[in-house]
């Protein structure tokens, strides 16, 4: 245990917090260009073909981002907006693409949780 004199001379260093989404550089979202759009398989015990994209960001980073929802229109050179948020069963995927902004269209025929998938409110059915 240090003496009071040692603490005066060399104060205790604060533990530095490590960010979970360094590519955003403290911003809520970042714009980027898709360099590759592909599917990948999740960790055990899950099984699927998850849609992901490799995105080159305006901050200079190149990251892997998840494409949420059923069906998408993204391809190489699509401009997208990404946010933080990892995908638990995809190692290395720490970002999500925001649907309904820039080149990423909203999910079609989405009824619930529409705001999360960039879908406009459906027109009321004609009687």
From Swiss-Prot:
Record key words, sorted: Methylation, Ribonucleoprotein, Ribosomal protein, RNA-binding, rRNA-binding, tRNA-binding
Record-linked InterPro entries: NA-bd_OB-fold, Ribosomal_uS12, Ribosomal_uS12_bac
SUPFAM superfamilies the UniProt entry points to: Nucleic acid-binding proteins (SSF50249)
Modified residues (3-methylthioaspartic acid): 89
Biased composition regions of type Basic residues, renumbered to the chain: 109-127
Matching PROSITE patterns: RIBOSOMAL_S12
GO cellular component term of the entry, any: small ribosomal subunit
Residue span of region Disordered: 1-28, 104-127
GO BP, sorted A to Z: translation
Listed Pfam families: Ribosom_S12_S23 (PF00164)
Coiled-coil ranges (or none): none
Keyword Zinc: no
Domain of life: Bacteria
An example Gene Ontology molecular-function term: tRNA binding
Function statement: With S4 and S5 plays an important role in translational accuracy.
Stated family: Belongs to the universal ribosomal protein uS12 family.
Subunit (UniProt): Part of the 30S ribosomal subunit. Contacts proteins S8 and S17. May interact with IF1 in the 30S initiation complex.
HAMAP family to which the protein is assigned, alphabetical: Ribosomal_uS12_B
Protein name per the record: Small ribosomal subunit protein uS12
